[in-house]
């Protein structure tokens, strides 16, 4: 995240770091699954999921990936249907610092709404990965404005923007975009990084059926 601040311990108990063996993507958790971006899973086999800590160098609990589930309509050229699940080898044990994320029950998010993005992505292009989880408040951008910058945009995607110098960067992919404690987006792509163009997220609401079907 470019332009963010250090997240306090325990504020985002659903946020996880995917490692192979170093941090490469974010994700969010349910009892047995991690929700992330498809592009974080393609071509990877050894995944570990680290939960419960805002510091990368302080591992609270680590779970091994048992199965990687990529949405079969994921298109790596157009970057659509960029959603995936990791089934971990055992149930994630919940504590004060480890909690499942809530998923949306309706598609009520609209342009101008404030949303919170968290992640351990780079703090500028080719910059370092921060040790402390970063947080930033962004705004939802209307689809037309976003389409003018990302022509292939579909209704199953959603965009954010605030100003130049704020936004997602490499390593934030797969991480959660949250409105009022409900995850509405998954970090998908953007023009790297924070150069004044909207970030694009997979719209979680559009994939609720897929998520349910695949969390067996």
Curated annotation (Swiss-Prot):
Keyword list, A-Z: Disulfide bond, Hydrolase, Protease, Secreted, Serine protease
Source domain of life: Eukaryota
GO CC terms in record: extracellular region
Subcellular location(s) of the protein: Secreted, Extracellular space
Principal location class: secreted
Residue ranges annotated for the Peptidase S1 domain, each copy included: 1-216
One record GO biological process: proteolysis
Disulfide bridge partners, by residue number: 25-40, 146-159, 169-193
Enzyme Commission designation: 3.4.21.1
Listed Pfam families: Trypsin
Name of the protein this chain belongs to: Chymotrypsin-2
Species annotation: Vespa orientalis
Lineage: Eukaryota, Metazoa, Ecdysozoa, Arthropoda, Hexapoda
């Amino acid at each position: 995240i470019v332009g963010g601040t250090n997240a306090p311990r325990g504020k985002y108990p659903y946020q996880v770091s995917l490692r192979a063996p170093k941090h490469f993507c974010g994700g969010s958790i349910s009892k047995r699954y991690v929700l992330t971006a498809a592009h974080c899973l393609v071509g990877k086999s050894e995944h570990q999921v680290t939960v419960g800590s805002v510091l990368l160098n302080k591992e609270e609990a680590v779970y091994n990936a048992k199965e990687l589930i990529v949405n079969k309509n994921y298109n790596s050229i157009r970057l659509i249907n960029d959603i995936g699940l990791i089934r971990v080898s055992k149930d994630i044990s919940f504590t004060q610092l480890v909690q499942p994320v809530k998923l949306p029950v309706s598609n009520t998010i609209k342009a101008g709404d404030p949303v919170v993005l968290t992640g351990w992505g780079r703090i500028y292009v080719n910059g370092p990965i921060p040790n402390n989880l970063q947080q930033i408040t962004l705004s939802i951008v209307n689809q037309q404005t976003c389409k003018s910058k990302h022509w292939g945009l579909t209704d199953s995607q959603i965009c954010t923007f605030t100003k130049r110098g704020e936004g997602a960067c490499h390593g934030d992919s797969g991480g959660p975009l949250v409105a009022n404690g409900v995850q509405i987006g998954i970090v998908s792509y953007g023009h790297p990084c924070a150069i004044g163009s909207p970030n694009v997220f997979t719209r979680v609401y559009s994939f609720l059926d897929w998520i349910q079907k695949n969390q067996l």
